[in-house]
């Protein structure tokens, strides 16, 4: 049984894909997708020995060694062109780390049809990197699990031009304005309002930065001033 977060990631994996799951931990995601008959085969990549061994044992326990290869490798070094990987998932890492993994493996991405990225933070930095490196966001989603909000970015090769609002809030999420999106940014606005209250009135520039951030949230949530 996988988490709601991984379920949502899995929902964006196309039928019949050949998957690379980077930072696969216990290989939960590839195991789930293979057992449901959604994907042909998978590579579970892990850079840390402990999680790598856990993934190996888990794949063996599910009798899926023929379908899922577990590889000890750093990021996108876990696959080669001959593997014919069509989809890559990178979930549960910081946005900057995901960008770095993609940066280091950029040459490996030429034939990959789709990236499904689930950053735990710094989604804005990841979006900027994608734009600068000619990747295009084609879908986004958001959910809440155990009190945390998670955003998912579905990406393919292509150009996009993001506004400052798109970078911060997401080009699709900010248009859909789902209940989870509203909850996330209402919570963030409360934190910013509190922080603003701690800054002396004389610190005009510092205060203005927070005022602008709060105003941007109000605008994207369609809240009147």
Regions found by a protein language model. Give the residues of each.
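Class I S-adenosyl-L-methionine
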Residues: 2, 96-225
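Conserved SAM-binding loop of SAM-dependent methyltransferases across substrates and taxa
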Residues: 26-39
